């Protein structure tokens, strides 16, 4: 496993501890809500939740914002644009777009673990335009073409 250094800035609304891995083999760190007041997410609605942090990722890395499984299974709270992408050149506050797919309104309290963030390396592509693609067994079979 490679460990990279990522610079992190605590903003004025920051609360609690820096994002941390819950276990030795956790892929993501928990993001904490840094809202000044309780935020109500009504059933079927979306709210933007501040985290109070900004980061500076190295080139060729992104941060992916993903749901926390406990919030999803217990309350129907998930990340609306999952996975959300934080680009390496973004320096603003990381915010999480949460949606309530549950059956009850849900309150986001300051200090609550609201999402997880995974740092991932990515590659850039150089498109090679062509009029013919190589044949495969699947071909152009799309949704459901490989079975249920």
UniProtKB/Swiss-Prot annotation:
Gene3D superfamilies: 2.70.40.10. Keywords: Hydrolase, Magnesium, Metal-binding, Nucleotide metabolism. Pathway: Pyrimidine metabolism; dUMP biosynthesis; dUMP from dCTP (dUTP route): step 2/2. Substrate binds at residues 68-70, 81, 85-87, 95. Its EC number is 3.6.1.23. It comes from the Bacteria. It catalyses: dUTP + H2O = dUMP + diphosphate + H(+). Coiled coil: none annotated. GO terms for molecular function: dUTP diphosphatase activity; magnesium ion binding. One of its GO terms (biological process) is dUTP catabolic process. It holds the Pfam family dUTPase. The keyword Zinc does not apply. The keyword Hydrolase applies. SUPFAM superfamilies: dUTPase-like. InterPro entries: dUTPase (IPR008181), dUTPase-like (IPR029054), dUTPase-like_sf (IPR036157), dUTPase_trimeric (IPR033704). HAMAP family: dUTPase_bact. PANTHER family: DEOXYURIDINE 5'-TRIPHOSPHATE NUCLEOTIDOHYDROLASE (PTHR11241:SF0). NCBIfam families: dut (TIGR00576), PRK00601.1 (NF001862). This enzyme is involved in nucleotide metabolism: it produces dUMP, the immediate precursor of thymidine nucleotides and it decreases the intracellular concentration of dUTP so that uracil cannot be incorporated into DNA. Belongs to the dUTPase family. This is Deoxyuridine 5'-triphosphate nucleotidohydrolase. It comes from Rickettsia typhi (strain ATCC VR-144 / Wilmington).
